[in-house]
């Protein structure tokens, strides 16, 4: 499922999580058109005329920032497997380095200890 966030120059944003609609701006325009025509056709439109007008005004702004957030990220499919293998190899390498360091340190300590015993 894809998400689309659109931000216009006034800072108003539109959120769409319907995967069948490609562009939520088209849907926002259609919705506000329907609201405006319905309000104009209604006899009691005088009290409600302000709200559809602002909706039309805001819906027709060009998108200033268009951000598409889809579920295709690095944790999908092959990318996830490659990341897991890379982390696994990194952990093995670090573990071998640490083991070698500990072994060398212990060996040096034992050698120093034996040398000090031989000197006595």
Curated annotation (Swiss-Prot):
Glycans are attached at residues 29, 68. The chain crosses the membrane at residues 74-94. The keyword Transmembrane helix applies. It is a single-pass membrane protein. Keywords: Glycoprotein, Host membrane, Membrane, Transmembrane, Transmembrane helix, Virion. GO terms for cellular component: host cell membrane; membrane; virion component. This is Uncharacterized protein B117L.
